Amino acid sequence: DGSVQLFRPDMNIARMKNTCERMCMPEVPGDLFMAGLKAVIEADKDWVPSGKNTSLYIRPFMFGDEVSFSVLPAKHYKFMIILSPTGSYYAANDAGLTTARIYVQDTYIRAARGGTGYAKVGGNYGGGMRASQDAMRYNCKDVLWLDAAEHKYVEEIGTSNAFFVIGDEVITAPLDSGTI
């Protein structure tokens, strides 16, 4: 019907809260987050794509805003939300299926228990750059990350959860492990 819908904003607000807690940043109140989200989408509604397999990518983020080189939590922060129209991450093949070659990474790690893997922080992306470049060399679209301890248990794909269907059962990495 042409209306703009938000997908699980409550879960995104909760993830931001968890990230802020982990990074010693002040929590963004849920009502402020939602009001900001609605305001920026309303202001930029002409950027919302309407084509098949398109969406508006929404990236909320926060950073310390002060002059300091210390490795301490900041006293002042800025919370921002940026938007970008986007298409399908993976292109459909001739049969109309969306598939992708995935590179299994067994050397580097993206996250370890006790780390920041569950939080939305830039370092998680930075740590994956080498593996992403390796994947591209093999004509792969993304990286399948294995566990940090033994490099044999599936954790996640860089851009999404990984799951397997065996019979009637859906198997995925534990969501409470602290790494995804």
Could you tell me what each predicted segment is?
Residues 25, 46-50:
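Secondary-structure boundary/capping residues
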